[in-house]
């Protein structure tokens, strides 16, 4: 989309030359770049306005309408916003992600920016996020955007409601509507340390007979501290893909996923240094 905006900026500049003969003017050496930049900025602002309006008109009482156009708006916005925030996302293992089937993607959770990073890093997957219901009150704009992307709010303390979310998420995968992303720790880790894995969310994959894409996200906690002052390096690593057809026991899956995540996280700069193997129970 950004390349299209650059091309359109050039086209607009060329069209302006027809009535005003800009290229024949002595001051064209500085006016042409100004027009190119101005046209590009105008298109970017228009993009943001369209995205803003698209989210504001979302009716939370109606089923979401997950469209390719809206997903393109969001993905392009993230491509523009992250560099402005001086965020550099480093990715590894993306080639492991299944291309022809929906899946359950699981990651550790250290900051509220984690969903945006996952969405940015895995642009080709139609991901629906499971998010805590408190997002509706804390970040209403984000909540509306997640709703439009088939997101599922979950009450972590209400087992009956959580079971409904698992059923709906399973349906999204079974019907090949969306892949689903969940943070199986259940909460944002305030210290960055990996919290015990709640295996209940893994029923989404076992019931849908879907693969589990195990990932880690590291560095998002530093974004607010570094904002505009220095670059923040964020690392999104796809570690493994687990076929649930070979393992239907969610407790065992949770233990395995926790071990895989921990093995990666302890190599990251800034990860808590105490002996994690002795302090974390993944059951």
Language model: regions and residue ranges:
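Non-catalytic C-terminal accessory region of glycerolipid acyltransferases
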Residues: 6-9, 163-283
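Catalytic core of membrane glycerolipid acyltransferases/transacylases, capturing the structured
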Residues: 55-74, 83, 98-158
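A generic local structural motif
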Residues: 76-77, 89-93, 115-116, 166-169, ...
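Short acidic-hydrophobic, aromatic-tinged amphipathic segments that line or gate anion-handling sites
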Residues: 91, 152-155, 244
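Membrane-anchoring hydrophobic helices of lipid-metabolizing enzymes
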Residues: 1-20, 24-102
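Generic preference for hydrophobic
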Residues: 91, 105, 129-130, 236-238
């Amino acid at each position: 989309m950004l390349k299209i905006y650059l091309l359109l900026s050039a086209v607009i500049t060329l069209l302006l030359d027809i009535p005003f003969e800009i290229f024949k003017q002595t001051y064209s050496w500085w006016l042409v770049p100004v027009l190119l930049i101005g046209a590009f900025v105008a298109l970017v602002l228009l993009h943001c306005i369209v995205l803003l309006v698209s989210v504001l008109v979302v009716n939370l009482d109606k089923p979401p309408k997950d469209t390719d156009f809206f997903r393109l708006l969001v993905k392009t916005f993230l491509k523009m916003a992250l560099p402005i925030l001086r965020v550099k996302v480093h990715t590894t293992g993306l080639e492991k992600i299944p291309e022809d089937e929906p899946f359950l993607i699981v990651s550790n959770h250290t900051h509220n920016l984690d969903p945006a990073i996952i969405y940015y890093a895995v642009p080709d997957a139609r991901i629906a996020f499971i998010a805590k219901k408190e997002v509706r009150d804390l970040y209403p704009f984000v909540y509306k955007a997640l709703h439009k992307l088939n997101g599922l709010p979950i009450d972590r303390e209400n087992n009956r409601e959580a079971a409904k979310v698992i059923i709906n998420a399973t349906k999204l995968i079974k019907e090949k509507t969306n892949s689903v992303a969940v943070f199986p720790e259940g909460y944002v880790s305030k210290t960055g340390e990996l919290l015990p894995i709640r295996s209940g969310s893994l029923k989404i994959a076992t019931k849908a007979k879907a693969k589990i894409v195990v990932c880690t996200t590291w560095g998002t906690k530093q974004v607010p501290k570094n904002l505009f002052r220095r670059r923040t390096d964020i690392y999104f690593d796809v570690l493994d893909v687990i076929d649930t057809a070979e393992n239907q026991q969610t407790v065992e899956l949770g233990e395995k996923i926790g071990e895989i995540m921990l093995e990666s996280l302890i190599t990251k700069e800034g990860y808590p240094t105490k002996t994690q193997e002795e302090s974390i129970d993944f059951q």
